[in-house]
Amino acid sequence: MEASKQMRVSRPYKISESSKVYHWPDHSTAVLQRLNEQRLHGLFCDVVLVVEEQQVPAHRNLLAVCSDYFNSMFTLGMREAFQKEVELVGTSYVGLKAVVDFLYSSELELDGSNIDYILETAHLLQIWTVVDFCCEYLEQEVSEDNYLYLQELASIYSLKRLDAFIDSFVLSHFSTLSFTPDFLQSISVQKLCVYLSSGQVQHKWEYDLLQVALQWLTQQPEREVHTRRVLENIRFPLFPEDILLQRVKLAMCSLLPSEANGEGFVEEAMHYHNSLVAQPVLQTKRTLLRSEECLLFVGGEVSERCLELSDDTCYLDTKNEQWVKETSLPARRSHHCVAVLGGFIFIAGGSFSRDNGGNAASNLLYRYDPRRKQWIKVASMNQRRVDFYLASIEDMLVAVGGRNENGALSSVETYSPKTNSWTYVAGLPRFTYGHAGTIYKDFVYISGGHDYQIGPYRKNLLCYDHRTDVWEERRPMTTARGWHSMCSLGDSIYSIGGSDDHMESMERFDVLGVEAYSPQCNQWTRVAPLLQANSESGVAVWQGRIYILGGYSWESTAFSRAVQVYDSEANRWSRGPDLPNAIAGVSACVCALNPRLEEKKKRNKDKCQDRGQ
C-alpha cells in the first residue's frame, strides 16, 4: 500500500463478531440492461444468429441460459458451438428478433401480425415462457370465427393449455357452433367425442346432441366407420320412452345405414327404462346426468312447537348463495335417513309425526330420480326405523339400528335394487339408536348412540364388513355422544357434535367437540370444535368440505338454520348460506341434478362472462 494511503489509526483486531448479508434487488435487471446495451452496440457478442439472410447478434451464455435448444447446441459438441454465425431453419426473422429482444428486455409485444411467427420461434427454441405468453394472448382472442384455426395451431405445437381453453370455449358455445358448416366439416372425430361425452356441454336437451352426432356422421361417407364411437357418447337412457321410439329411433333409421346398428343403443335404453326398480345398479356413462353434483337437504322438523314436518328437498345454488327447492317428498318426514345410490336419492324410515319417540316410526323407502324428477315407492324395510343410519355401499343400501314402537333396535338389513327386497344381515352387538355412521373404503362405521338404558351416551366405534358379514369393535371415541354426525373425508372419519347426559343429573348438554379417526392407525385426534350446537343435523361432504346443516341445541332448546362448513386443511369451521328455516331431524346428501333450462342458460352465460367473452 502506498504511503499516502496508509491508515493513521491501526485496525482493531475485530470490528464486529456479527455478519450481515446485503442484497441488491435490482441486480439481475441491471445486468440484463447492460447486456442489452452491449448487444445493441455490438460489444462482446460471440454469436450471430442468421435467418432469412438477416442477422441477430447475441451472447451465447444468455441464449444457453434461457433456451434448452441453445443450451444443447452449445454444450453437446455440435459444430454450431464453434461457429461465429449459426443459421437457423424453421423460423422467421420477425419471430427470432422478437424472441431474442425478449430475452434481453423481458418485454414481449404480441399482436395479430406477429403472434404466429413468435409462437413458431419460441416453440422451436424451447423458450416456454414465451410460449405461455402466446397462449395467454390467444386465449383472449378465441372467437366463433377463429377457434378452429387456433385449435389446429394448438395441435401443431402441442399447446395443451390453449387446447383445453378452446375445448372449454366450444363446450360453452356448443349449441351455436355445432350446427355450423365449419364445425360439421372440420371438427375431428376425436374432438367431437370429447364434446359429446362431456358433462359440461351446452345443450337444451339430449336430442340436440344426437342431431349433431347424426349430422356429423352423414357429412362424409367415410365417417360411417365412426358410428359406434360417436353414438356411444349420446346418453340414450335420458330420453323418455316415447321420444326414444317415436323420434330417436326414426332419426337413426332414416339417416344411418342398417349395418351401422344404431338401433342397439335404443334397445339398450329401452331395457334400462323397463327395469325401473333396478336402475340404480344399471348405471353406465350413458345414464349419467350432464350436470355437477349439488348439496341437498331433505325433510326435517321445521319448528319445535308448531308440530310441523317438512317435505322440502332443496339444493344449494352456489352462484346466488341460496337454497332452491328441487322437489317435494311423497310424505313429510323427520329423523329419517337419506342415501344416494347410482345417482338416485333414497329416503328411508323416519318419523311421520312430531312424536319422535319411535311410536311414529316408518319403514317406507322412496326413491327419487333426478333425471325425470320423479319419486317412486320401492320395497319397505322389514322393520320400522327412526333415529337410525342408512348407507349406500356397492350395489345395496344398509339400514343400521334405530328404534320404533317396540324400543331400540339392534337389527341390520340390506336393500338390493336388483331384487327390490330387504334382507337381514348380522345385527349390532347391542341395541342402538341416536348413533351416527359413515362409509370408509367399503366398510360401514357407526359410533355413539344410546340403547334406552339409563346413563350417558356411548363412545363405541363399530366397523362392519359386508363381505364377511361381521361387526368389529374399534378404538372408542374420546367423547361420548349421540344425535351427532359422522362423515368421511380424505383418510379420516369425523365424529361431529351431538349431545350427552350428565352422569349425576341426567340433564342433556351439547357437545361441540369434533374428533377425527384414522382407520389406518386406529387412533382418534381432536380437531377444531363446532361454532354452535348441532344435534340431529344433516351432514354431507361436498367439494372437499364437510357441511353440517341445521340441528338442535339441548341447552338452549332451539332449532338452528345455520350451515357450518369445515375445511380440514385449515382445521377451521365457517358459516355457509343459512337454511330457509330453522330445522332439525334433517338429512343431507350430494347428488347430480337435472338443471332447469333457464339455469342452463344462466350457467352458460356466467361461464362466458367469467372468460371475458
Curated annotation (Swiss-Prot):
GO BP: any one term: protein ubiquitination
SUPFAM superfamilies named in the record: Kelch motif, POZ domain
Molecular-function GO terms, alphabetical: cullin family protein binding
Keywords: Kelch repeat, Repeat, Ubl conjugation pathway
Residue ranges occupied by any BTB domain in the UniProt entry: 45-112
InterPro entries in the record: BACK, Beta-prop_ATRN-MKLN-like, BTB-kelch_protein, BTB/POZ_dom, Kelch-typ_b-propeller, Kelch_1, SKP1/BTB/POZ_sf
Positions of Kelch repeats: 294-343, 344-395, 396-442, 444-491, 492-544, 545-593
Signal sequence range: none
Keyword Repeat: yes
TM spans (from-to): none
UniProt domain BACK: residue ranges: 147-249
Pfam families in the record: BACK (PF07707), Beta-prop_ATRN-LZTR1 (PF24981), BTB (PF00651)
Biological pathway: Protein modification; protein ubiquitination
Quaternary structure (record): Interacts with CUL3.
Function description: Probable substrate-specific adapter of an E3 ubiquitin-protein ligase complex which mediates the ubiquitination and subsequent proteasomal degradation of target proteins.
Record protein name field: Kelch-like protein 36
Species annotation: Mus musculus (Mouse)
